[in-house]
Amino acid sequence: NAAVAGAVIEGATLTFEVLQ
């Protein structure tokens, strides 16, 4: 659902930021 998709996007964004 939308909440899960939002959480996945947030997690991916956080991971991307950490890896920069």
Swiss-Prot record:
Region (Plays an important role in the hemolytic activity): 3-12
Source domain of life: Eukaryota
Keyword Ribonucleoprotein among record annotations: no
Cell location: Secreted; Nematocyst; Target cell membrane
One BP term from GO: killing of cells of another organism
Single GO MF descriptor: toxin activity
Keyword Ribonucleoprotein attributed: no
Any Gene Ontology CC annotation: membrane
Signal peptide (residue range): none
Region annotation N-terminal region: where it falls in the sequence: 11-20
Keyword annotations from UniProtKB, A to Z: Cytolysis, Ion transport, Membrane, Nematocyst, Secreted, Target cell membrane, Target membrane, Toxin, Transmembrane, Transport
Free-text note regarding domains: Composed of a long N-terminal alpha-helix and a core region rich in beta-sheet structures. Before the pore formation, the alpha-helix binds the lipid membrane, partitions into the lipid-water interface and stabilizes the monomeric molecule on the membrane. Finally, it traverses the bilayer, thus forming the transmembrane pore.
Assembly and oligomerization: Octamer or nonamer in membranes. Monomer in the soluble state.
Homology family: Belongs to the actinoporin family. Sea anemone subfamily.
Record function comment: Pore-forming protein that forms cations-selective hydrophilic pores of around 1 nm and causes cardiac stimulation and cytolysis. Pore formation is a multi-step process that involves specific recognition of membrane sphingomyelin (but neither cholesterol nor phosphatidylcholine) using aromatic rich region and adjacent phosphocholine (POC) binding site, firm binding to the membrane (mainly driven by hydrophobic interactions) accompanied by the transfer of the N-terminal region to the lipid-water interface and finally pore formation after oligomerization of monomers.
Protein name: Cytolysin tenebrosin-A
Organism: Actinia tenebrosa (Australian red waratah sea anemone)
